[in-house]
Curated annotation (Swiss-Prot):
Part of the 30S ribosomal subunit. This is Small ribosomal subunit protein uS10. Gene3D superfamilies: Ribosomal protein S10 domain. One of its GO terms (biological process) is translation. Belongs to the universal ribosomal protein uS10 family. InterPro entries: Ribosomal_uS10, Ribosomal_uS10_CS, Ribosomal_uS10_dom, Ribosomal_uS10_dom_sf. GO terms for cellular component: ribonucleoprotein complex; ribosome. The keyword Hydrolase does not apply. HAMAP family: Ribosomal_uS10. GO terms for molecular function: structural constituent of ribosome; tRNA binding.
Amino acid sequence: MERIRLRLKAYDHRVLDRSVASIVEAVKRTGSEIRGPVPLPTKKKRYTVLRSPHINKDSREQFEIRVHHRIIDIMSATPDTVDSLMKLDLAPEVDVEVMSMSK
């Protein structure tokens, strides 16, 4: 039995929350203990570009990208838990990072 940490990232928080819910449901079906999901601070990236390619430096446009993060800890992962996580079909825009941590 080992501890697994899942770190999920997405631009859309609704898609991220649906993916987190499906992961939590799959882990609970196998009987493993779970901690989370823990929402981490949203990172905001702002970009400012000139509207005109030639003149009018005062005329600018601002864009923002928000990256939402969640962490899920699976405290006692069994082989069934790992199999159920591998079979999950998550949204393609959700980035999942898996870290294995021994006790």
